[in-house]
Amino acid sequence: MFYFSPLAAARLAYGGIAQLKKPFSASMSFDRLAAHYHWMEKIFAGGLMQRCRTTFLAHTKDRRHALLIGEGTGKFLVELLRVNPRIQITCVEQCAGMIQQAQQRLAREQLDVSRVSFQQMDALRWTSPPGKFDLVVTNFFLDCFRSEQLQKLIPQLAESATDDAIWLLADFRVPEAGWRRWRAGAILASLYLFFKLMTSLSASWLTPPDKFLANAGFKLSDRRLFNFGFAHADLWMREG
């Protein structure tokens, strides 16, 4: 089994920078990392992040309209298409390189691309007709934003959801105490340094989104912890 380690995070933060040659962007952009993200995730996390992403996949089988925000290279997207042959999916992703990676993944897996609409847009500026999606997915994405940005983003996404929508999210977390907390803090410090340098990430630290989801009318139905509590998968349901 692969375990996150501060050493692996530090190597990612410092050793990988020299390999990425594109100029920096003044605003948050993952363009410089798109071609490298797959191997970076594999080295850093093995299959753990994908296990987090797909923990509650079975709950998506009856959904019809899905909103995937910050989907990246499409690892969750292909699994969603496999388990739900009728779902229509909107993927909002700011990075053109990530969209290209996701489209190539769909082609390799020979999945029905006609059921997927890619929209290249900053999530903070994206808008949708209210009440359209019965599934919202934010995997390893909300950790990119500061508290005041989440306060704007989450209600905006919730507005696009139906009254019976479910919200799946996977992300990192900081355990409450002990060596697990210190370990998570060391890893996250390295990760935020790396992504701030490489992507102009706006956030400097992790903001739990729970209170914003609750204020938007969602209730935590289930949470699974991974890797000594450093990662989690959540199932949120709208209370109606």
PLM features: residue spans?
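N-terminal, positively charged/glycine-rich alpha-helical extensions of SAM-dependent methyltransferases
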Residues: 2-35
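A short glycine-rich, Lys/Arg-flanked "PGG" loop and its adjoining helix->strand segment in the class I
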Residues: 151-163
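Conserved alpha-helix/loop element of class I SAM-dependent methyltransferases that forms part
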Residues: 46-63
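Core SAM-dependent methyltransferase catalytic element
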Residues: 216-219, 224-240
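A short SAM/SAH-binding and catalytic strip from SAM-dependent methyltransferases
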Residues: 135-149
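A short acidic, Gly/Pro-enriched loop at the edge of an enzyme's catalytic core
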Residues: 126-136
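Class I SAM-dependent methyltransferase SAM/SAH-binding core
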Residues: 67-125
